[in-house]
């Protein structure tokens, strides 16, 4: 990742359910982790019920419950001000998940044009992108990638780890 990067965005996009039935409610979230690979406090987990991190460095555009916020662009966005991240945070893991996927019997393979991407928020240059519909067709949650500190600069690593166990499994993994 370029050294001069100060602000990144994580965009999640998808099309509304055109086939009837339950809406597809995809969510973008972030776990801000300390040295022990856990969130130091609950407010370092940014999601629909906590739209701004404790340090104010990560914020959410809000919860789009249908995929109808944009015609072809991002429906939900996380914005990260890298210069404002608390010194105790060593990495930020970005997640795409389907709300109540098990109850609604949904997975990414059913959601048309679903993607998650990370980009330089100052230039809009895309750094990485996953097509959720194809790459994670049977999953309900994806650990997309992580920003991590190395020698006082932020770097990005794609992860691409999908699961059928929902966001709850990652809350158990990353929360103290």
Specify the residue positions occupied by each region the protein language model found.
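Intrinsic-disorder/low-complexity signal
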Residues: 1-176
């Amino acid at each position: 990742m370029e050294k001069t990067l100060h602000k990144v965005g994580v965009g999640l996009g998808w099309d509304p359910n055109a086939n009837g039935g339950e809406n597809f409610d995809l969510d973008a979230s972030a776990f801000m982790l300390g040295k022990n690979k856990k969130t130091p406090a609950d407010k370092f987990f940014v999601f629909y019920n906590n739209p701004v991190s404790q340090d104010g460095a990560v914020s959410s555009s809000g919860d789009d419950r249908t995929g109808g916020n944009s015609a072809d662009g991002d429906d939900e966005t996380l914005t990260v001000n890298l210069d404002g991240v608390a010194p105790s945070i060593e990495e930020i893991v970005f997640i795409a998940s389907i709300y109540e996927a098990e109850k609604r019997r949904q997975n990414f393979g059913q959601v048309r044009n679903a993607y998650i991407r990370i980009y330089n928020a100052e230039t809009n240059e895309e750094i990485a992108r996953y097509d959720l519909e194809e790459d994670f067709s049977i999953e309900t949650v994806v650990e997309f990638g992580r920003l991590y500190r190395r020698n006082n600069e932020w770097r990005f690593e794609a992860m691409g780890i999908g699961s059928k166990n929902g966001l709850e499994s990652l809350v158990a993994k990353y929360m103290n």
